[in-house]
């Protein structure tokens, strides 16, 4: 571990030099790239340097204990030694976690797509509930949300809805939401009080940068049309909605807000995210043949969570976490779930680094 930390510290110093190089300062792409890399290493280097300082302090104290016979001084030195011996192992654990390879997409903005699945109108209402939950969670984290495309249900909620979440770390906070979400509750229209089970699927797509996904203009077919609301009525009287088709893959992205220019930009953003997601899924499938993740496969059809309204219970099936606080969670208080899933992922990666042992 310490050899790795020395390499990280050495790279950090190299980046300091690069960032003061005029050739780098005058190259916006290089400056952004090296600045981000340095920022990613900053905490690891800070903790490692603090660790080394405390390690030296402990050695100095041990040397002083061997040289002094003064009772008061010995007592004081022993207290300092004991405190450092307690602190250093905690710092070592922190350094292990800091060395875990970071998901390169963690800091990115995302596109979230929610689709009503089994359960008819109740599934659409639940899709709307999930949309509201994620919007509140995003707001609590200082992220900005914006609807890209929405197909409303006649009885409330959405048949499907996609929206962007913008802000540093959006993907790291929402990536575990990929999969099928199941709700168990009595629908408002149910007179007999029977509990119905419905599902909605969630896809979280990291937004792609131009360098990560290349799209040629000749591979695109762009159509404009009038958008429709619930029940099929026309929302706009002009052809402002945009549909972009990527001809080589057949991937389609649409946006149906009021401005055609904004719709084109939004649809293009979604198209890039979907193509990038296809690329990531292919890579993950190769990786999945070698290992199975504790926090799920990322498969959109995998049931990941159940929301049981009669018992006010939410269960995340990937890590066996059950919380009796459904109302708070549906109000966007997802921190406890996200933190538990993040810890599970970190533990798993740590095992891999240590060849299967913690």
From Swiss-Prot:
Modified residues (N5-methylglutamine): 233
Coiled-coil segments on the chain, per record: none
Keyword check for Protein biosynthesis: yes
Domain of life (superkingdom): Bacteria
Keywords: Cytoplasm, Methylation, Protein biosynthesis
Gene3D superfamilies, sorted: 3.30.160.20, 3.30.70.1660, 6.10.140.1950
PANTHER family cross-referenced by the UniProt entry: LD18447P
Name the record gives this protein: Peptide chain release factor 1
Organism: Staphylococcus epidermidis (strain ATCC 35984 / DSM 28319 / BCRC 17069 / CCUG 31568 / BM 3577 / RP62A)
């Amino acid at each position: 571990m310490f050899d790795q930390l020395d390499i990280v510290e050495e790279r950090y110093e190299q980046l300091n030099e690069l960032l003061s190089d005029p050739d780098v300062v005058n190259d916006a792409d290089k400056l952004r790239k090296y600045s981000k890399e340095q920022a990613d290493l900053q905490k690891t280097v800070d903790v490692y340097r603090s660790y080394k300082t405390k390690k030296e302090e402990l050695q100095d104290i041990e040397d002083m204990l061997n040289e002094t016979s003064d009772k008061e001084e010995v007592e004081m030195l022993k207290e300092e030694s004991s405190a450092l011996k307690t602190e250093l192992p905690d710092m070592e654990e922190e350094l292990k976690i800091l060395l875990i390879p970071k998901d390169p997409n963690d800091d990115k903005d995302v596109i979230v797509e929610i689709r009503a699945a089994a359960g008819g109108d109740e599934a659409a209402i639940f899709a709307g509930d999930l949309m509201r939950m994620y919007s509140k969670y995003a707001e609590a984290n200082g992220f900005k949300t914006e609807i890209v495309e929405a197909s409303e249900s006649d009885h409330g909620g959405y048949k499907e809805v996609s929206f962007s979440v913008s802000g540093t770390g959006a993907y790291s906070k929402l990536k575990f939401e990929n999969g099928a979400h199941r709700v168990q509750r009595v629908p408002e229209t149910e007179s007999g009080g029977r509990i119905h089970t419905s599902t909605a699927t969630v896809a979280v797509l990291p937004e792609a940068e131009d360098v990560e996904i290349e799209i040629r203009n000749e591979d695109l077919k762009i159509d404009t049309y009038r958008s429709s609301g619930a029940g099929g009525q026309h929302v706009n009287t002009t052809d402002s909605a945009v549909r972009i088709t990527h001809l080589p893959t057949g991937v389609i992205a649409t946006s149906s807000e009021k401005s055609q220019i904004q719709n084109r930009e939004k649809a293009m953003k979604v198209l890039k995210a979907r193509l990038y997601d296809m690329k990531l899924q292919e890579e993950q499938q190769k990786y999945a043949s070698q290992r199975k993740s504790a926090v799920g496969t990322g498969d959109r059809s995998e049931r990941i969570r159940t929301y049981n309204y009669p018992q006010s219970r939410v269960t995340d099936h990937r890590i066996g976490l059950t919380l009796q606080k459904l109302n708070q969670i549906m109000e966007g208080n997802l921190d406890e779930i996200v933190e538990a899933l993040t810890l599970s992922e970190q533990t798993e990666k740590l095992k891999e680094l240590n060849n299967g042992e913690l």
